[in-house]
C-alpha cells in the first residue's frame, strides 16, 4: 500500500520539465528526519527495476518503478523493525533483512516476497554477519553471537556462534560452540579451488592457556562438517594465532599473529589446500596491514610502517610464483581504521592509483600535523610510478609552478562522492582533486576526468560534486556537494559538456545511486529537503531513447570503438609485453546500452621483451647505473642456513603480469654465481631511547600469555609516579596525566600474569586484567599497612579473591593507636569486607599442591597483653564468621614455602627460637636440629629453599655486626629432622644469605663461606670463599676455572674462584642463572685466596651448570638472558659506557654494539623475568642526578626465523647432559638428564618454541651421592657419616609409620636416601632391621613370613663351620708368610703381606657376627611380638608461594 503524508512519506510527484533542450522525469520521496547515527540504505537490482529502501526508523520499503512510488516491503500487520539490510553479492535478487529481534527476513525475488527465519533466543547479529559461496548462491554462513547477562561487574558476555545453510535459510544448522567464525573457500568468482563446499573456520582451542588470537586455529571443513582438517602453518603451532581469513581475487589470505614474535604474518592459498607463507624482505615490523584488491596475477598488501596516530604505509605486491612481497611504493596514505589510498582501477589491467605522504618527516616530529598527499599512478602493476599531469589549461603560481601536478581524493575520502571507475567504461577515471604541490581539502576540490587511463586529464566541473554514471557511460550525473541547490547536472559525452535540470525544492545532496539494471536509466539522489531525508528519482530514458548498436565482427560500424590504453602518435604501443584493446562506447554518440557488451581486454599482439619489461629479482635492487645489483641483506635468509654456500641467482626477471617474449641470448635471462656475503648483523638491532625525569624504584613486567615481547611494562619512579609502556620502553607514557596521582606501589597478581593493582596515596586502586590496556578505578578500604607486610595477597585457585593488608590510625606522626587491619575481596577489589580488628596479618594457606579447603586462612592475632612479644597464630575456614582455631602462641611469623608451612615461635621462657613445620596445613611438628646446634633468641632463621622436597634453612650462629654467619641445615622430606650440610655460611645484617640455587638444575647450588670466622668475630673484615654442590648440599667443592694458570700464573694451588653472592647484589631479582637457559651461570668475582673487592673483580661464565668456569670480561659486568639464553647480553657495571656486548654462542665470543652516542653509568640491565624476551631495557643514570635514560634494545630482527624442535632432526637444538670434569654424564638426583639448548650459531630465535626442556635419559645405580647423613649424624672426611658426639640415633618409628599405607618401620642407619633421587640398585646404605607398625602386625607377617626353625639351625651350623674353615686357612697361610718377615713400624706403604691379607680377611670374618645377628632377628621374630606405639597423622604434600624469608626476634635481638 502507499504511505500517506502523516507517515512522513509524501506521495510521489512527477514533473516533465524541458531544461536546456533536454527532457527528464524526476520524483521526490520524503523519508522523515534521520538521527545522526542512522541513515537510509538503498538496494537496487540488476535484473529488475525494483528498489528496496531501509529508512532511518527501521521501516523497509519497496519500489517497483525505480523509486517513483513506495510501499511496505513486508506485508505484515505488525511489521518488524529492520536494523540491517544485505544483498547477495553473487545473486543480487536475494536480500536479507535483520530485525531488531535478530530474526532474518529473506527474499529471493528482489524484495517482492519474504519468509522469516526465527533465530534462537539471545542471538545477536552484528554488522557484516554473512559469508557467501560464489558458486552456490543457496549456501550461506551466518556468523552471529549468543549473549548472556552477567553481574554488574561482568556485564553482558557474548560468545561467537556460527550457523550455515545449503538452501538459503530454509534449514539452518549450527556449528560447535568453539567455532569463532567461518567463511567459504570459494568466496570470489576468481578463486580456482575445486571443493565448492569447503569452509574455513576459526576454532578456539579451550585447552590452550592463551588469549585470542593465540588460542585460535584455522580448520578446513567439508560439507555439513562431515570432516575437519587442521590447517598447518607451523609444524608445532599448527595455525595458532590466526586472526582472520579473507578471499581476495584468486587468493585466500590468512592473517596470523605469530605466537613468538607477535608480528602479523600472511599465508595465501590458491586452492584452499596448500598454504604458502608470504615473505617480506626488508619490511618494517608488521603490526597492521591491509590486503588490497589483487590484479589477475598478483596480490596487493599495504603494511603500516609507522605507529603514528596519523599512519603511513608501504605498498607491496606478491606473486604466487615466489611468495615474496616486493615493495612497490613508500609512504602510502593510511588511516587508523586500516583503509588505504591504493586503488586498482576497474576494467583496466595493471593500473593503480595511490596517494603518498610527502611530509612524513614532519609527522614524526608532530603526528597531529596535516598530511600533504601526492597522487601517483602506475600502468605496470606498481613497478613504476609517475605523478599525474595537470590539465593543460590549469597552472600553478609562484614557487609551485615547477612541481605542479594533479592530485586526487582516493579511497579514504572519495568513495562517498562517487566511483573512480565509471560502470563498464574502460580507461575513464572520475575523481575530485586539486592542482598544486599536494592535495587540497575536499572543499577546495574540483571534478576531473581522464579518458586515457590517467595519462591526461581535463577539468569537468568546478567545485566538489557527487557524481555517478550509468552502465557503459551513457549518461553522467553530478550534483553539488556541501551546499543547497535545485540543479542536477548530466552529461552525455563523458563529462566534457554538462546540461542541468532544475527541481522545485532546494536540496542538499548526500549521495547518488546509479541504476544497476540495463533496463533502467533512473538515478536516485539521497538528499536533505527541508531538513528531511529524501530521495530524488531522475529518469533519463526520455532523452536516451535510442539503443546503442554493437556488432562484434564490425565494431567500428556501431556505437562502440576499440580503445587502446597506450597510444603514441595514433599508433597503439606495447604495454606490459602486449598490445591490447578494450570495447568502449564512443564518447560522441547518445544512446543507451540495453545488452551486455564484453569489457575485458583483448590481446592483439605479443611483444618482444625490452628493458622496461624487466625488474630486479627478489635478491637484487636497482643501482644508479640502471643495473640490478645484489642486496646482501636480502640474501641473509639463504646464507644463514649455509654461510659458505655458492648461490645461482638471476638478477632480472620479467615483470609480474607481463606477457613479453624474451629475445634470444638475452643477457637479462642469464644467472650469475656468487658466494654468500659476510654480513654485519648489528644493524639489524633496533634501539629506542627515552628520557625519564626521575629515578626508578621498580619495574613490573606484565608478560601474560602469547609472544614474549607482548609485555606491558609498569614503572614506579622515586617521586611515586607510574609510567607504562606497551612496546618494551620504546615509549613511556605517564599514568593518568590529568589527575597526576601519587602511587604507593605496583602489585602484580601472583597467579595471573596479565593482572595488576596500582595503589595511590589517595586510597584509589587501579586494577587491570588485560596487561594495562585498560584499568578499573576502585576504592581501597584503608591506607596500606606501615610495618612492611605485603599489601596484597592473592589466592591461587580463585584469582578474584584478594586479601588487603591495610592500616588504621596511622596518619598522625605519633602512631599512638596505629595498627594493621585485614580486608577481603571476592571480586578483585570492587568491594571489601573487614576481618576482625585484632588480626595483624593473614595469608591464604592454599598452595599450588596443598589439598586443603580453599577458604583456609592463617592469621597472626595480636595478644591482649601490651608488653607481650609475638602473636597467636589462628586459622579460619569461614572468614572468621565463627570462632577461629588456635594453632600456637608466641609466634613471630609464619611462611608458606613450597610443600611446607613454617612457623617461627619463641619457647615458653622466651629465651630461644623454635621452628615448627606442617605439610598438610593442620598438624605441626617441631623441627629437630642437630644436637650441636641451638638457636637462641638473639639468633635467627632464614628459609633458603624448598624446591627439592627438603627445607634448606640458614641458622645464624654469629650475629655480631660485620661477622654474621651461620650453618645451612637441610631437612628430611617432611621438614622435621635437620642435618648440617655447610658451616660458616655468610649472611648480612638484613638476614640475606649467600646461598643460591642454580635455576633449572635442581641439585646444584652456590654458597659463600666465611674463611676467617674467628678473626671476623674479633673485628677483622670477613674473607669469603665460594663453594658449589652438585648433589643438593651433600658434598661441597671449590669452583674450577679453565686455564687458571694461563690467566693467573702467579697464583698457587690455594687459589680458587670466588664470587660475590646474593648479599652484595644491588637488585635481588637479577639472576645469576635462568631456567630458560639451563646450565648457563654468570658470576662476578676473583681467582684468588679469597674473594677480592667488587671493583677489582672480573666476570666469569659457566655453560655446564658450574662444573667448568671461563673468564669472559676483565671487569664487573651486568648481564641479561635474552631469548631463553640463545642471546646473552652484558654491559660494564662500574664504568660509564655506551657499548653493550651480546653473544650468540653462549658467551664464547662477544660482539660490541653501540647503543648511544654519549657514555652513561648503567644502573640496571632489565628484561622480562621469563628470560624468553628478545628485548632488553638498559637503564642508565642521566646527566642529572634525578634523571634516568631508558634504552630499549630490540634483537627480534637479528634472526630470520623461529627455531624448530624435532627429536628426529635436531638441526636447531642440541641436547646437553650435565657431566663431571672427567666428561662422564653426571647423575643428578639419581638420573642422567638431557636438556635442550639452541645450537650456537643457528639463525633462529627460540621465542615460545614448544621444545622439551628436559628429558630423563636413564636412572643411575645408587651411590653414596644418593644418600645424606641421617639426623644427629655428620659427614666427615671421606664422605662417611658418623654419629655426633654425645647424640643418639633418631627414633623414626613415628615418622615412618605416619606415611600413607605404611606397614613397617626400619631401624635407623647413619644414612637416609635423598627424597628426589630416582636411583635404582647399586649401593644400599639406608636399610636395616624392620619392625611392624603398631596395628599392622598381621600385614607385616604376610610380607615377612616367619623362617622355619630347621632353616635357622642349619644357618647357625653353617656359619660355625665356615668360621672354622676360614680360621684354619688363615692361620696356615699366616705362618708361611711370617717366615723372614721384617716389621717397619706403622707406615702403611710398607704394610706386610700378612697385614694386607688380614685386612681382606677382616672384612670376611666381620660378616660372621652380622650374619649371626640376622639369624638372631629371624629367630626373635618367630617368638617375640613387637610393642605397640602411637602413630602420627599422615602428611599431604603441597607447594607454597615464596622461596625465601627471614624470621627474627627483632624486638629482643642485641649485638654481641
Swiss-Prot record:
Sites where a glycan is attached: 44, 330, 349, 974, 1135
Parts of the chain on the Lumenal side: 23-1348
One Pfam family in the UniProt entry: Sortilin-Vps10
BNR repeat spans: 62-71, 106-114, 448-458, 489-499, 823-834, 1100-1110, 1141-1150
Organism domain of life: Eukaryota
Keyword list, A-Z: Glycoprotein, Golgi apparatus, Membrane, Protein transport, Receptor, Repeat, Signal, Transmembrane, Transmembrane helix, Transport
Gene Ontology biological process terms from the UniProt entry: Golgi to endosome transport; Golgi to vacuole transport; protein targeting to vacuole
GO cellular component, one term: late endosome
Protein's membrane topology: Single-pass type I membrane protein
Transmembrane segments: 1349-1369
Signal peptide: 1-22
SMART domains documented for this protein: VPS10
SUPFAM superfamilies per the UniProt record, alphabetical: Oligoxyloglucan reducing end-specific cellobiohydrolase
Broad class of the protein's primary localization: Golgi
Residues exposed to the Cytoplasmic side: 1370-1456
Compartments reported by the entry: Golgi apparatus, trans-Golgi network membrane; Prevacuolar compartment membrane
Family stated for the protein in its record: Belongs to the VPS10-related sortilin family.
Known role: Functions as a sorting receptor in the Golgi compartment required for the intracellular sorting and delivery of soluble vacuolar proteins, like carboxypeptidase Y (CPY) and proteinase A. Executes multiple rounds of sorting by cycling between the late Golgi and a prevacuolar endosome-like compartment.
Listed name of the protein: Vacuolar protein sorting/targeting protein 10
Native organism: Schizosaccharomyces japonicus (strain yFS275 / FY16936) (Fission yeast)
Lineage, uppermost ranks: Eukaryota, Fungi, Dikarya, Ascomycota, Taphrinomycotina
Amino acid at each position: 500500500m502507499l504511505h500517506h503524508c502523516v507517515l512522513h512519506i509524501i506521495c510521489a510527484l512527477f514533473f516533465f520539465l524541458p531544461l536546456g533542450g533536454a527532457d527528464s522525469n524526476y520524483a521526490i520521496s520524503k523519508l522523515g528526519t534521520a538521527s545522526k547515527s542512522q541513515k537510509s540504505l538503498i538496494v537496487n537490482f540488476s535484473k529488475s527495476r525494483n528498489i528496496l529502501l531501509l529508512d532511518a526508523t527501521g521501516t523497509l520499503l519497496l519500489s517497483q518503478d525505480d523509486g517513483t512510488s513506495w510501499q511496505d516491503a513486508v506485508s505484515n500487520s505488525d511489521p518488524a523493525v529492520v536494523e540491517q539490510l544485505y544483498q547477495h553479492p553473487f545473486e543480487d535478487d536475494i536480500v536479507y533483512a535483520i530485525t531488531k529481534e535478530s530474526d532474518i527476513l529473506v527474499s529471493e525475488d528482489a524484495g517482492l516476497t519474504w519468509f522469516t527465519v526465527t533465530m534462537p533466543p539471545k542471538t545477536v547479529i552484528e554488522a557484516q554477519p554473512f559469508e557467501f559461496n560464489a558458486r552456490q548462491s543457496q549456501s550461506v554462513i551466518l556468523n552471529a553471537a549468543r549473549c548472556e547477562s552477567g553481574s554488574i561487574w561482568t556485564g553482558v558476555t557474548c560468545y561467537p556462534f556460527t550457523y550455515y545453510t545449503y538452501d538459503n535459510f530454509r534449514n539452518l544448522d549450527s556449528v560447535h560452540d568453539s567455532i569463532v567464525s567461518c567463511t567459504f573457500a570459494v568466496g570470489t568468482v576468481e578463486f580456482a579451488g575445486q571443493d565448492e563446499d569447503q569452509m574455513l573456520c576459526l576454532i578456539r582451542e579451550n585447552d590452550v592457556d592463551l588469549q585470542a588470537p593465540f588460542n585460535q586455529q584455522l580448520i578446513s571443513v567439508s560439507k555439513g562438517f562431515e570432516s575437519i582438517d587442521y590447517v598447518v602453518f607451523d609444524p608445532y603451532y599448527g595455525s595458532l594465532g590466526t586472526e582472520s581469513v579473507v578471499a581476495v581475487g584468486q587468493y585466500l589470505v590468512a592473517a596470523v599473529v605469530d605466537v613468538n614474535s607477535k608480528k602479523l604474518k600472511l599465508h595465501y592459498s590458491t586452492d584452499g589446500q596448500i598454504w604458502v607463507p608470504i615473505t617480506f624482505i626488508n619490511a618494517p615490523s608488521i603490526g597492521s596491514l591491509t590486503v588490497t584488491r589483487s590484479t589477475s596475477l598478483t596480490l596487493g598488501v599495504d603494511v603500516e610502517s609507522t605507529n603514528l596516530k596519523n599512519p603511513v604505509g608501504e605498498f607491496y605486491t606478491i606473486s604466487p610464483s615466489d611468495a615474496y612481497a616486493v615493495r612497490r611504493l613508500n609512504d602510502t596514505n593510511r588511516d587508523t581504521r586500516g583503509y588505504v589510498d591504493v586503488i586498482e582501477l576497474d576494467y583496466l589491467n595493471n593500473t593503480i592509483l595511490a596517494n603518498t605522504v610527502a611530509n612524513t618527516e614532519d609527522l614524526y616530529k608532530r603526528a597531529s600535523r596535516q598530511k600533504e598527499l601526492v597522487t601517483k599512478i602506475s600502468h605496470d602493476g606498481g613497478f613504476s610510478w609517475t605523478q599525474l599531469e595537470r590539465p593543460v589549461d590549469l597552472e600553478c603560481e609562484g614557487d609551485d609552478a615547477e612541481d605542479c601536478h594533479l592530485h586526487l581524493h582516493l579511497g579514504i575520502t572519495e568513495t562517498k562522492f562517487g566511483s573512480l571507475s565509471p560502470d563498464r567504461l574502460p580507461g575513464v577515471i572520475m575523481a575530485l582533486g586539486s592542482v598544486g604541490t599536494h592535495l587540497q581539502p575536499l572543499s577546495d576540490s574540483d571534478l576531473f576526468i581522464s579518458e586515457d587511463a590517467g595519462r591526461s586529464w581535463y577539468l569537468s566541473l568546478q567545485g566538489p560534486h557527487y557524481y555517478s554514471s550509468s552502465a557503459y557511460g551513457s549518461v553522467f550525473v553530478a550534483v553539488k556537494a556541501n551546499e543547497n541547490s535545485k540543479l542536477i547536472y548530466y552529461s552525455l559525452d563523458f563529462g566534457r559538456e554538462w546540461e542541468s535540470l532544475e527541481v522545485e525544492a532546494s536540496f542538499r545532496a548526500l549521495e547518488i545511486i546509479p541504476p544497476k539494471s540495463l533496463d533502467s536509466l533512473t538515478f536516485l539522489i539521497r538528499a536533505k529537503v527541508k531538513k528531511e531525508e529524501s530521495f530524488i528519482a531522475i529518469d533519463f530514458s526520455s532523452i536516451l531513447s535510442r539503443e546503442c548498436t554493437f556488432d562484434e565482427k564490425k565494431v567500428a560500424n556501431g556505437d562502440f570503438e576499440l580503445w587502446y590504453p597506450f597510444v603514441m602518435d595514433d599508433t597503439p604501443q606495447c604495454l606490459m609485453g602486449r598490445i591490447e584493446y578494450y570495447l568502449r562506447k564512443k564518447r560522441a554518440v547518445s544512446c543507451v546500452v540495453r545488452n551486455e557488451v564484453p569489457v575485458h581486454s583483448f590481446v592483439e599482439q605479443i611483444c618482444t621483451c625490452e628493458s622496461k619489461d624487466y625488474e630486479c629479482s627478489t635478491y637484487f635492487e636497482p643501482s644508479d647505473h640502471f643495473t640490478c645489483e645484489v642486496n646482501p641483506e636480502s640474501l641473509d635468509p639463504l646464507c644463514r642456513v649455509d654461510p659458505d654456500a655458492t648461490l645461482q641467482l638471476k638478477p632480472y626477471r620479467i615483470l609480474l603480469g607481463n606477457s613479453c617474449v624474451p629475445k634470444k641470448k638475452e643477457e637479462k635471462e642469464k644467472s650469475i654465481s656468487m658466494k654468500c656475503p659476510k654480513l654485519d648483523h648489528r644493524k639489524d638491532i633496533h634501539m629506542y631511547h627515552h628520557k625519564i625525569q626521575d629515578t626508578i624504584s621498580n619495574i613490573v613486567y606484565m608478560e601474560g600469555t602469547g609472544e614474549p615481547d607482548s609485555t606491558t611494562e609498569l614503572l614506579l619512579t622515586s617521586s611515586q609516579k607510574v609510567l607504562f609502556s606497551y612496546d618494551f620502553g620504546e615509549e613511556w607514557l605517564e599514568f593518568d596525566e590529568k589527575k597526576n596521582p601519587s602511587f604507593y606501589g605496583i602489585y602484580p597478581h601472583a597467579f595471573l600474569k596479565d593482572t595488576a593493582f596500582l595503589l595511590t596515596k589517595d586510597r584509589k586502586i587501579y586494577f587491570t586484567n588485560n596487561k594495562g590496556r585498560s584499568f578499573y578505578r576502585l576504592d581501597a578500604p584503608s591506607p596500606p599497612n606501615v610495618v612492611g607486610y605485603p599489601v596484597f595477597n592473592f589466592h591461587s585457585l580463585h584469582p578474584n579473591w584478594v586479601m588487603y593488608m591495610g592500616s588504621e590510625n596511622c596518619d598522625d606522626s605519633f602512631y599512638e593507636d596505629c595498627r594493621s587491619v585485614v580486608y577481603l575481596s571476592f571480586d578483585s577489589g570492587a568491594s571489601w569486607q573487614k576481618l576482625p580488628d585484632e588480626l595483624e596479618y593473614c595469608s591464604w594457606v592454599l598452595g599450588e599442591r596443598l589439598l586443603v579447603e580453599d577458604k583456609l586462612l592463617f592469621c597472626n592475632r595480636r595478644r591482649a597483653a601490651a608488653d607481650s612479644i609475638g602473636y597467636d597464630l589462628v586459622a579460619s575456614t569461614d572468614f572468621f564468621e565463627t570462632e577461629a582455631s588456635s594453632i600456637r602462641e608466641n609466634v613471630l611469623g609464619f611462611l608458606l614455602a613450597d610443600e611446607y608451612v613454617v612457623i617461627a615461635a619463641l619457647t615458653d621462657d622466651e629465651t630461644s627460637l623454635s621452628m615448627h613445620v606442617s605439610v598438610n596445613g593442620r598438624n605441626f611438628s617441631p623441627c629437630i636440629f642437630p644436637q650441636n646446634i641451638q638457636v637462641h633468641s638473639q639468633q635467627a632463621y632464614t628459609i633458603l629453599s624448598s624446591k627439592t622436597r627438603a627445607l634448606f634453612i640458614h641458622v645464624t650462629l654469629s650475629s655480631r655486626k660485620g661477622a654474621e654467619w651461620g650453618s645451612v641445615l637441610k631437612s628430611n622430606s617432611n621438614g622435621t629432622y635437620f642435618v648440617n650440610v655447610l658451616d660458616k655460611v655468610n649472611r648480612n645484617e638484613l638476614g640475606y644469605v649467600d646461598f643460591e640455587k642454580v635455576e633449572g638444575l635442581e641439585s646444584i647450588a652456590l654458597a659463600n663461606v666465611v674463611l676467617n670466622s674467628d678473626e671476623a668475630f674479633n673485628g677483622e673484615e670477613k674473607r669469603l670463599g665460594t663453594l658449589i654442590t652438585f648433589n643438593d648440599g651433600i658434598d661441597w667443592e671449590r669452583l674450577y676455572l679453565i686455564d687458571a694458570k694461563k690467566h693467573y700464573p702467579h697464583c698457587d694451588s690455594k687459589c680458587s674462584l670466588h664470587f660475590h653472592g646474593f648479599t652484595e647484589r644491588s637488585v635481588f631479582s637479577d639472576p645469576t642463572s635462568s631456567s630458560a637457559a639451563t646450565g648457563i651461570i654468570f658470576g662476578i668475582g676473583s681467582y684468588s685466596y679469597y674473594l677480592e673487592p667488587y671493583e677489582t673483580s672480573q666476570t666469569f661464565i659457566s655453560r655446564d651448570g658450574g662444573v667448568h668456569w671461563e673468564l669472559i670480561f676483565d671487569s664487573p659486568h651486568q648481564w641479561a638472558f635474552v631469548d631463553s639464553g640463545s642471546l646473552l647480553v652484558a654491559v660494564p657495571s662500574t664504568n660509564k659506557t655506551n657499548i653493550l656486548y651480546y653473544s650468540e654462542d653462549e658467551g664464547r665470543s662477544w660482539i660490541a654494539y653501540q647503543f648511544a652516542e654519549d657514555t652513561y653509568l648503567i644502573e640496571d640491565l632489565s628484561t622480562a623475568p621469563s628470560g624468553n624476551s628478545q628485548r632488553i631495557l638498559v637503564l642508565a643514570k642521566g646527566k642529572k642526578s634525578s634523571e634516568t635514560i631508558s634504552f630499549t634494545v630490540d634483537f627480534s630482527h637479528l634472526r630470520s626465523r623461529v627455531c624448530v624442535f624435532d627429536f628426529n632432526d635436531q638441526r636447531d637444538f642440541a641436547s646437553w647432559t650435565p657431566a663431571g670434569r672427567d666428561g662422564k654424564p653426571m647423575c643428578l638426583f639419581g638420573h642422567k638428564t638431557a636438556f635442550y639448548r639452541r645450537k650456537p650459531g643457528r639463525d633462529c630465535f627460540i621465542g615460545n618454541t614448544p621444545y622439551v626442556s628436559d628429558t630423563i635419559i636413564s636412572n643411575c645405580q645408587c651411590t653414596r651421592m644418593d644418600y645424606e647423613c641421617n639426623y644427629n649424624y655428620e659427614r666427615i672426611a671421606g664422605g662417611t657419616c658418623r654419629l655426633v658426639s654425645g647424640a643418639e640415633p633418631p627414633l623414626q618409628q613415628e615418622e615412618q609409620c605416619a606415611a600413607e599405607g605404611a606397614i613397617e618401620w626400619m631401624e635407623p642407619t647413619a644414612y637416609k636416601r635423598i627424597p628426589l633421587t630416582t636411583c635404582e640398585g647399586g649401593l644400599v646404605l639406608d636399610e636395616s632391621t624392620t619392625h611392624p607398625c603398631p596395628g599392622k602386625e598381621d600385614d607385616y607377617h604376610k610380607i615377612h613370613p616367619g623362617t622355619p626353625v630347621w632353616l635357622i639351625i642349619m644357618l647357625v651350623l653353617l656359619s660355625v663351620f665356615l668360621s672354622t674353615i676360614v680360621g684354619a686357612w688363615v692361620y696356615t697361610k699366616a705362618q708361611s708368610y711370617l717366615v723372614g718377615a721384617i716389621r717397619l713400624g706403622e707406615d702403611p706403604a710398607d704394610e706386610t703381606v700378612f697385614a694386607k691379607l688380614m685386612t681382606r680377611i677382616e672384612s670376611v670374618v666381620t660378616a660372621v657376627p652380622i650374619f649371626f645377628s640376622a639369624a638372631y632377628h629371624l629367630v626373635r621374630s618367630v617368638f617375640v611380638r613387637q610393642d605397640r606405639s602411637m602413630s602420627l597423622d599422615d602428611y599431604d604434600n603441597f607447594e607454597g608461594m615464596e622461596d625465601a624469608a627471614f624470621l627474627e626476634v627483632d624486638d629482643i635481638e642485641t649485638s654481641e
